[in-house]
Amino acid sequence: MAYLDPTLLILLVLAGLGIISHNMTVTLAILVLLAIRITPLNSYFPWVEKYGLSIGIVILTIGVMAPIASGKITASEVMHSFLHWKSLLAILIGVAVSWLGGRGVSLMSNQPSVVAGLLVGTVMGVALFRGVPVGPLIAAGLLSLLIGKT
């Protein structure tokens, strides 16, 4: 009987969830990971694990900041955001979410046993509910409030 790699099976199931839910983000990410896994590129997994999250956050930040950099959102609009209650609330929520993300990074580093559950939950949220894969850090931050930071 041929050996079936359980990790490949998990990745295939997750890719299938991405396809079924028409979520190209999940599908593409999982297919890239599958390609890395089954080729000699698999020796780069330690690098991907170490820097992938940071690179992803940089790319996400570029996407979020692009309207300011391109001039679509002007400097005066940014300054006026401090004068409206909705914008002030958005700033406060942004601060809170960033704080939660920081707690999440700490929890994921100090309690790696929770990472698998957070990742599965995030992929399910992305695949089934059209979410975006920023969930693990925020989910870990929320989890840290419930179970403690370390």
UniProtKB/Swiss-Prot annotation:
Main location (coarse class): membrane
Stretches that traverse the bilayer: 1-21, 51-71, 82-102, 127-147
InterPro entries named in the record: UPF0756_TM (IPR007382)
Subcellular location, record wording: Cell membrane
Record flagged with keyword Transmembrane: yes
Membrane topology per record: Multi-pass membrane protein
Keywords recorded for this protein, A-Z: Cell membrane, Membrane, Transmembrane, Transmembrane helix
GO cellular component, one term: plasma membrane
HAMAP family linked to this entry: UPF0756
Annotated family: Belongs to the UPF0756 family.
Protein name: UPF0756 membrane protein PC1_1142
Species this chain originates from: Pectobacterium carotovorum subsp. carotovorum (strain PC1)
